[in-house]
């Protein structure tokens, strides 16, 4: 039986190789590449479900009192020296520089108040709302003046609004010891770092304590839903295994009370069953997160030229990933990423294995996000080292690829917004294994073509959408026009280009229900029997929003 499988595998090899050279492949029979397309759809859905980050100031404190203005006049004296209380936020050299503008001059009470105002201006510029400079009662004997610096000390810290998130988890990242001077800039940095690296969001509120010079810190917590469930039906499946499919997405937040996330994504069509389970958990106080995932799929070819050959396949992948933020502020997030994946893929013709492969993939990369109130841009390049094994013929290949993804969104006037998404792969080797090819065509890449219309060793695609929020006319309606483009590169032909344009909409008449549709028009013919347009639609239901 093993010899028969080998003979049949060699017999089919010329067909698949010829198709690969032509870059007009027959309907996909590789479960690995079908799994990658499903993974794209999962990633796109998870991107849409990302919890919005908190806008506005991370720390809110009482308004600083207006500077006291005292009319000039009255007794004047020669200011010989100014002394200050110790400060945690202003260096002695900076204080001396302020005082130098006044020392050695004739001055009155109004001039002294100007000196105090200069110090308070420094506090204000540095966001230190819990500190104040004052001029205490004194005689100014010998031209010596003392300026009192009161820098608020933390009296107590409270946490409110956390239902599924542990108080200890929050204070581990935003923790300031009581009875010490409250470092407001550090508090702001800690809150921003936490918010940019967690779904849970914090707003720090500063309030006067029971005595002058004491400050209470209240951490107001905003949490995502504990459970998120989406059930959907669409025609975005792979044509060879059935375009009509149903699926669900489930997310459980805060299982351990530490912003951990358990997710499941599954789809089912006539010839395809695929599921992905993942768990992601923070492992340090600086936003580092460790994730594990398992994906398994089974296919049966129900359409296309291989339908009569009883083609089936299966694939699975286990992966571990780690992300560690390196630099975080209100406008930037730079994160190092690492991952390891082990995958297995097998294709059978009439229950005889014709391909059976496994791979080990090591990935290292970086993601950079720049964001503001009206825009967000993310670029995430990565380097991959892959060891691929052919378990039937016994071959081993080692090769490297450079991959990446990018997305951007910009709010425009008149209820308009612009979004861009893209991905790429570059491989130095040629004729990569089928489950490592870069494919384009379909609802997540170039919408004017069927899924996996073309594939190659290297490639790219991008989507550009101009949206118009029509909610003022019809509640929950968003319309857009789009332009998609992509290319794949291999040996023959060296390049296959796909371009399309079209229109789409998303309509949520009520919060639990969303209808999505798009029509893409291809700009050129690249596959046989190519349709004049591609329609993709989806209906999504969120039952938990009814509760």
Question: Locations of the language-model features?
Answer:
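Outer-membrane beta-barrel translocator/channel fold
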Residues: 294-318, 324-325, 329, 343-349, ...
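C-terminal outer-membrane beta-barrel translocator/porin domains of Gram-negative envelope proteins
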Residues: 346-485, 489-491, 525, 537-542, ...
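Outer-membrane beta-barrel channels and translocator barrels
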Residues: 199, 224-226, 255-257, 284-286, ...
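Periplasmic polypeptide-binding modules associated with outer-membrane biogenesis and secretion
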Residues: 23-237, 265-274, 400-402, 422
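Transmembrane beta-strands of outer-membrane beta-barrel proteins
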Residues: 229-231, 260-264, 288-292, 320, ...
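Transmembrane beta-strand segments that form the barrel wall of outer-membrane beta-barrel proteins
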Residues: 227-237, 248-252, 258-270, 275-277, ...
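Residues that define the transmembrane beta-barrel architecture of outer-membrane proteins
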Residues: 213, 242-246, 271-275, 314-318, ...
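Outer-membrane beta-barrel "beta-signal"
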Residues: 250, 505-507, 512, 531-547
């Amino acid at each position: 039986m093993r010899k028969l499988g080998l003979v049949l595998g060699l017999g089919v090899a010329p067909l698949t190789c010829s198709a690969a050279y032509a870059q007009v492949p027959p309907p996909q029979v590789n479960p690995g590449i079908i799994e990658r397309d499903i993974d794209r759809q999962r990633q796109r859905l998870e991107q849409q479900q990302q919890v919005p980050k908190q806008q506005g100031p991370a720390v809110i404190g009482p308004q600083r009192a207006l500077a006291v203005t005292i009319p000039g006049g009255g007794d004047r004296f020669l200011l010989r020296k100014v002394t200050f209380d110790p400060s945690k936020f202003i260096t002695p050299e900076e204080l001396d520089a302020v005082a130098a503008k006044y020392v050695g001059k004739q001055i009155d009470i109004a001039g002294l108040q100007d000196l105090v105002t200069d110090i308070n201006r420094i506090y204000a510029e540095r966001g230190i709302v819990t500190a104040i400079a004052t001029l205490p009662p004194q005689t100014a004997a010998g031209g010596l003046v003392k300026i009192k610096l009161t820098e608020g000390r933390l009296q107590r810290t409270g946490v409110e609004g956390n239902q599924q998130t542990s108080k200890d988890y929050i204070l581990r990242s935003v923790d300031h010891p009581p009875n010490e001077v409250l470092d407001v800039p550090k508090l702001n940095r800690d809150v921003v770092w936490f918010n940019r690296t967690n779904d849970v969001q914090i707003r720090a509120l500063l309030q006067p304590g029971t005595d002058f010079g004491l400050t209470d810190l209240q951490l107001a917590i905003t949490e995502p839903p504990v459970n998120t469930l989406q059930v959907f039906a669409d025609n975005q499946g792979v044509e060879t295994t059935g375009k009509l499919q149903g699926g669900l997405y489930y997310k459980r937040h805060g299982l351990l009370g530490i912003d951990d996330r358990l997710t499941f994504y599954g789809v089912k069509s006539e010839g395809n069953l695929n599921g992905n389970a993942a768990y992601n958990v923070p492992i340090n106080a600086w936003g580092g997160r460790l994730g594990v995932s398992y994906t398994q799929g089974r296919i049966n070819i129900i359409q296309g030229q291989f339908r009569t050959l009883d083609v089936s396949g299966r694939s699975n992948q286990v992966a571990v990933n780690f992300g560690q933020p390196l630099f975080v502020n209100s406008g930037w997030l730079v994160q190092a990423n690492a991952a390891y994946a082990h995958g297995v893929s097998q294709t059978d013709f009439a229950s005889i294995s014709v391909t059976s492969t496994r791979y080990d993939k090591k990935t290292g990369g970086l993601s950079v996000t720049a964001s503001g109130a009206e825009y967000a841009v993310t670029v995430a390049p990565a380097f991959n080292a892959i060891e691929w094994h052919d378990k039937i013929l016994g071959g081993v290949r080692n090769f490297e690829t450079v991959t990446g993804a990018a997305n951007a969104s910009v709010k425009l006037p008149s209820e308009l917004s612009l979004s861009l998404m893209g991905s790429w792969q570059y491989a130095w080797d040629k004729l990569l294994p089928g489950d490592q090819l870069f494919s384009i065509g379909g609802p997540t890449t170039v919408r004017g073509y069927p899924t996996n219309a073309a594939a190659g060793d290297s490639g790219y695609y991008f989507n550009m959408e101009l949206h118009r929020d029509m909610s003022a006319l019809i509640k929950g309606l968003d319309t857009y026009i789009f332009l998609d483009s992509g290319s794949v590169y291999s040996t023959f032909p060296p390049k296959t280009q796909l371009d399309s344009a079209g229109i789409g909409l998303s309509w949520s008449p009520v919060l639990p229900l969303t209808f999505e549709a798009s029509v893409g028009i291809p700009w050129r013919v690249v596959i046989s029997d190519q349709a004049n347009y591609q329609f993709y639609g989806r209906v999504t239901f969120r039952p938990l929003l009814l509760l």
